[in-house]
Amino acid sequence: MLFSPPLQRATLIQRYKRFLADVITPDGTTLTLHCPNTGAMTGCATPGDTVWYSTSENTKRKYPHTWELTETQSGAFICVNTLRANQLTKEAIQENRLPALAGYNILNSEVKYGAERSRIDFMLQADFRPDCYIEVKSVTLAEKENGYFPDAITERGQKHLRELMGVAAAGHRAVVVFAVLHSAITRFSPARHIDIKYAQLLSEAQNKGVEVLAYKAELSATKMELNEPVPITL
């Protein structure tokens, strides 16, 4: 994924009201950015960090600038736009960069499924193969080199795991992909210290046939690409 037009650089003043952030540009202008992230963003929004933002051509948007990346004061890159996790995963599947998800010729997005009336991020299909249901989660919480999900209690995430267990029980392929969008992370675990229920459900899901995968993205201010498998400890 290439950023076109190129991202612009600023310095973070503060994030507030979950969806807004104030930054100051190199010429001293103060801007308010849209922050497309509902999580705690722990370690991703420290005042003084470098922010890389995109600008929409939609003149009707109240906040035309979108916070895409954080470049921390220690030099790590973090993609804070959670929408990018799905985009990167879709691109990687279509370009056959994820061998575990190769071999399908149809990819559908936001398909309704499950007893709890959810929407799956992706459903892959191919002749003579079971349908493959994929839920994608963005991983940005880092403690040293360890990456964790979630960064806050997520009842929605718990629901998705229950739905995937139902998919596996019905004979389909069920997969949860953790997209690691933090350059300092080298391994992944569920955040038991934040959401013990989610961690327990993830282990249960794996035991009941749900595949758990984690891939890391190469991140820069010019492009992003999901391709590197990350070790998982449940």
UniProtKB/Swiss-Prot annotation:
Keyword tags: DNA-binding
Keyword tRNA processing: no
Origin superkingdom: Bacteria
Pfam families named in the record: SfsA, SfsA_N
Entry's transmembrane regions: none
Entry-linked Gene3D superfamilies: 2.40.50.580, 3.40.1350.60
InterPro entries: SfsA, SfsA_C, SfsA_N
Residue range(s) of DNA binding per entry: 201-220
GO molecular function, one term: DNA binding
Function: Binds to DNA non-specifically. Could be a regulatory factor involved in maltose metabolism.
Family, as annotated: Belongs to the SfsA family.
NCBIfam families the UniProt entry points to: sfsA
Protein name (database record): Sugar fermentation stimulation protein A
Organism: Salmonella typhi
